[in-house]
């Protein structure tokens, strides 16, 4: 297990997904054991990121996802629509992809419930192109405090696992980063209900037999 506790001196923690045992996903997995909240800033969001953290994200009291409207080639059609529609289309496609995997039926209902309860909130920043990537974690213990992983990894399964990224953990500047996050969060549009509707529609496509067979 990699030490994610406060570092002494100027030791720098880099997470680049190059080490099979230490990827961005593993970093978030370990923080979920000790954190109460997670604030995510990402160019775009795919449901696979939360499914990969299934069993861990549930330990958090609050998750906020602040996303941009970036799209991958498979969702180019969204470019013809509005900014917020792009983000929703991207999520729609990512859900279709995840439905081919066995963890979809067990993972998505929990996410739906978390959005309904307000545990997970999603907003889209549409004032300008939003290209930021950061994971701000707030530990339950004041001794551990807060930390931020800032770099290039989007909150997508490839961004957390396969892509070579460059993410650096910061501890001393977290208050400044949190203020930046709050400012952009307030300027963003709440799309939690839209995300919920998209996910509910996909879950509803399964018959009771398919769910319990």
For each predicted feature, which ranges?
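PLD/PLD-like phosphodiesterase catalytic module centered on the HKD motif
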Residues: 1-213
């Amino acid at each position: 297990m990699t030490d994610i506790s406060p570092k002494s001196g100027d030791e720098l923690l880099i997470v680049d997904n190059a080490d099979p045992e230490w990827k961005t996903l593993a970093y978030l997995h370990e923080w979920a054991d000790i954190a109460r909240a997670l604030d995510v800033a990402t160019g775009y969001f795919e449901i696979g990121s939360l499914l990969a953290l299934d069993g861990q994200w549930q330990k958090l009291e609050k998750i906020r996802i602040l996303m941009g409207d970036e799209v991958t080639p498979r969702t180019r059609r969204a470019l013809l629509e509005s900014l917020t529609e792009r983000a929703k289309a991207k999520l729609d496609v990512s859900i279709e992809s995840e439905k081919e995997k066995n963890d979809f039926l067990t993972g998505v209902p929990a996410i739906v419930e978390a959005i309904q309860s307000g545990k997970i909130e999603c907003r889209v920043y549409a004032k300008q192109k939003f290209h930021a990537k950061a994971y701000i974690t707030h530990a339950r213990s004041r001794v551990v405090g807060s930390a931020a992983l800032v770099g290039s990894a989007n909150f997508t399964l490839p961004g957390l696992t396969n892509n070579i990224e460059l993410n650096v953990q910061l501890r001393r500047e977290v208050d400044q980063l949190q203020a930046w996050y709050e400012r952009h969060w307030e300027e963003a549009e709440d799309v939690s209900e839209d995300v919920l509707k998209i996910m509910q529609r996909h879950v509803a496509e399964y018959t009771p037999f398919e769910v319990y067979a």
